[in-house]
Amino acid sequence: MTEMECREFLARSSLGRLACARENEPYIVPIYFAYVPDHLYGFSTFGQKIEWMRSNPRVSVESDEVLNHSHWKSVIVSGRYEELPDEPKYQTERDQARMLLEKRFLWWQTAYAAMQLRRRQTHPTRHLVVPPLFYCIHIEGMTGRKAAPDSVEGRVGFEGELT
C-alpha cells in the first residue's frame, strides 16, 4: 500500500491491536483509536498495558480489514507511547483526543463506568473517581499490505517523523 493509502485506511479505522513488551515478554491487546496525521489517540483505564507501556514506550499497532482470504488490508504502525496526564500542559491534547474518540464511539464510557463500579464494590467506603487515562502514540514508522483478486499486493515502508 502507498503511504497515502495507509493514512486513508487509518483515518477510516477505529479498532486495532496494540503490541507492547516488558522484560522480553510481548503483550497484545485490542484497542480503539483515533488517527490524526503522525498520531494515534487512545483511552484506557489503568492496567497491564499501561504499566508495560510506561516501562517501555516502544509500541506497535496493527489494524486490518478482512473481507475474505483473498481480499484484505493491514496497516502496522510503530511508534512511541506518551501518556496525556490530567495536567494543564496536556489539556489541549487531552481535549483533542477526547473529541476525536467521542466522534467515533462511546464504548469507553461503558468501560469507564464499569471500572468505577468495580472500584466502589471493592472499596465501598472510598468514593474515589479515577480520571480517564488518555494517551498518544507518536507514529515513527508505518507499513501497509493488501490483497485483492485483481490487484498486486503492495507495500510501503518508511521511518522517522511523518509529514
Stretch-by-stretch model annotation:
Residues H69-T163:
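Charged, gly/pro-rich active-site loop segments
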Residues T45, S55-D64, H71-E82:
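Active-site-adjacent structural patch at catalytic or cofactor/ligand-binding sites
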Residues A11-S13, E25-P26, S74, L128-V130:
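Short solvent-exposed loop/turn micro-motifs enriched in small/polar/acidic residues
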Residues M1-R17:
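Short, basic/aromatic recognition patches
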Residues D38-H39, P57, E140:
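Beta-strand-connecting loop/turn residues
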Residues T45-Q48, L101:
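Short, solvent-exposed aromatic-acidic interface loops
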Residues S13-T45, V61-E62:
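Short beta-strand segments
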